[in-house]
Amino acid sequence: MLLRVTHCPVNTAGVPWHNVQALRRKGVDARLVVFERYKLHPEADWSLDRRGGFVRQQLTQARAFAKLLPQTDVFHFYFGLTLVPKSLQFPLLRATGKRSVMHFLGSDIRGKPPAQLAWADRAGAKIVGSYDALRWVPDADVVPPGIDLADYRPRAPSDAERPIVVHAPSARRRKGTKEVIAACAQLPVELEIVEGLQHDEARRRYERADIVVDQLNAGWYGLFAIEAMALGKPVVTFLHDEAVARTEEAFGTKVPIVNATAETLVERLRPLVEDAELRRSVGAASRAYVELVHDADEVADRLLAIYARL
């Protein structure tokens, strides 16, 4: 019998849409339903386009849930959000024999105490995107975000004496943009900050990069870094050492990202700025890493294994 999976209710960083597309390639009847379309990642099969105040929005969501319920075997929720209030959502799913997953994406759990996330135990399974995120949800399954690698043809970094450094902050303070600007001012580089663009246009900017700086505060990398690595770019970001070790053990490969803090960014960038061959070798290793860890088709297999045990 064909498995029917509804992913909802947001398309944060494009992760849900990548998952839906990969599951479809596996023969799953998968769909993405969102509250509203995001500017950066507008992809979805159905947008509720909620209007009005809280009560009207809740009615819109409840009607959508009622429509989706008979069409769905597994509800795959994201970002700590559900279609109807959590106090109703999970009891209703259990009463109707439906399976559920809560998939956390990073900023929805970062820094929150366990008691604040205990509600997620009502879901059939919990997923996080990295071993770093297990600090907040230690009993979750780790499924790194996947992308369709066929959409990302590697573009090797150039030999430019003033290489292009690309930084694409979703939130400047959280990503350490001020420190990135200060560091690049001390080096012979061209800094391009990519903000507020549609995803296709943003990716064209990423393709021009010789070096990519992701973030300096979070302790792990996000989808921007994954896309940059898929394009064969060397990525500089701040990583927690324990999460690096656990990732390398789990996947049997080195994490090729250049680890930096705000204090060490200049010294970590300098070798990449001065050595084009180093840029290319790190970029090639980055593409190989993404093929192993972030291939959307492999991610779909991990999701199917989780669904099967619910």
Task: Label the model's feature ranges.
Residues I109, D121-P154, A160:
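Donor nucleotide-sugar binding/catalytic pocket of nucleotide-sugar-dependent glycosyltransferases
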Residues A156-K175, I181-C184:
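Conserved donor-binding/catalytic core segment of Leloir-type glycosyltransferases
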Residues E277-Y307:
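A charged, aromatic-enriched C-terminal amphipathic alpha-helix characteristic of glycosyltransferases
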Residues P234-A243:
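Short hydrophobic beta-strand element within catalytic cores of glycosyltransferases
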Residues D210, A230-P234:
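A short alpha->beta transition loop at the rim of the catalytic pocket in nucleotide-sugar-dependent
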Residues V74-F79, F90-R110, A125-V128, V142:
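Active-site proximal beta-strand in glycosyltransferases
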Residues R4-P9, F65-P85, V101, V212-Q215:
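Short N-terminal targeting/anchoring amphipathic segment
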